[in-house]
Regions:
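ATP/nucleoside-binding phosphotransfer catalytic cores, i.e., glycine-rich phosphate-binding loops
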Residues: 133, 149-152, 200-275
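Short, well-ordered beta-strand core segments
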Residues: 49, 72, 161-162
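ATP/NTP phosphate-donor binding region
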Residues: 1-52, 60, 89-106, 115-125
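A residue-level signal for conserved active-site and pocket-lining positions in enzyme catalytic cores
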Residues: 13, 50, 76, 131, ...
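Gly/Ser/Thr-rich active-site loops/lids in small-molecule metabolic enzymes
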Residues: 155-199
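Proline-centered loop/turn at the N-terminus of a beta-strand
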Residues: 69-71, 189
């Protein structure tokens, strides 16, 4: 079958036998379609990455693959599966359609994050969902200042703050009463976590902005990135966030709809049935 995706890497992090079985079955299917199936260590040479698992597996894979400009498609064998939108039972049919050119491509923004202490960079990383400043092990409120493009925005005492991409707006930020941002929106949203005030509300800004969060009077705080990378923060530390220069490309099968995913996965705007 002629296809733009000649070399395909399969990624599955879960130790479950079900994921292993799916990896094996999909590998056989791809070889039958004339594709070369690459080992995960060779993913930089792939034309397409197929991720089997849940959203956590997809987050890790996307951050690793984005610098190689390898598009990704997800097969859900996790819990929610908001980013891994192909059901396991539809795996062969959907991947076959994608190989035949029947698919849509969607670019998703990542956050480029940097932690600076005393003028020196401590950590740089990427996040597809969100960067979160949160209280540490002692459970005390954090106090921090937020700057947008160098302009002071607010100072807040709270459990922390979430800075989410449109992709991450349906994750942790949603649980904290943040807005849903469509993936095509060039925006970030800042969502306070349990603020010690009656007036703090989420705010969305252009993703061309540089966001800085500066720790004040907070001796016990942490920064989390996609819930997978972690760094301890000290008073005076600066967390600098901006849009990554490279987006990740998601491949979707025929019939994919973001709003259908919202309804099916999150029960978005579902009417309450009366008996």
């Amino acid at each position: 079958m002629p296809t733009a995706f000649r070399r395909v890497v399969l990624i599955g992090k879960s130790p479950s036998s079900e994921v292993a079985d799916s990896l094996d079955a999909l590998g056989r299917f791809l070889r039958g379609e004339g594709c070369e199936v690459l080992a995960e260590n060779d993913s930089a040479q792939a034309d397409l990455a197929v991720v089997i698992g849940g959203d956590g597996t997809m987050l890790a894979a996307a951050r690793n693959l984005v610098r190689h400009k390898v598009p990704v498609v997800g097969i859900n064998q996790g819990r929610l599966g908001f980013m891994t939108d192909i059901a396991q039972e539809d795996m062969r049919e959907s991947i076959g359609a994608i190989l035949a050119g029947r698919h849509t491509t969607e670019e998703r923004t990542l956050i480029d994050a940097e932690i600076v202490r005393d003028g020196k960079t401590l950590l740089t990383t990427l996040a597809l969902n969100d960067a979160v400043v949160n209280k540490g092990a002692q459970g005390r409120l954090t106090e921090f200042e937020v700057y947008i493009d160098g302009e002071f925005v607010y100072r807040l005492r709270s459990d922390g703050v979430i800075v989410a991409t449109p992709t991450g707006s349906t994750a942790y930020a949603l649980s904290a009463q943040g807005p849903i941002l469509h993936p095509s929106l060039p925006a970030f949203t800042l969502v306070p976590l349990n603020p010690h005030t009656l007036t703090a509300r989420p705010v969305s800004v252009s993703d061309r902005s540089t966001i800085e969060i500066v720790l004040r009077h907070s001796g016990d705080a942490r920064a989390h990135f996609d819930g997978q990378a972690l760094a301890d923060l000290a008073e005076g530390d600066r967390l600098r966030l901006k849009r990554s220069s490279d987006p990740i490309r998601f491949i979707h099968p025929p019939g994919y709809s973001y709003f259908v995913m919202l309804r099916e996965k999150l029960r978005w705007s579902e009417a309450v049935e009366r008996n």
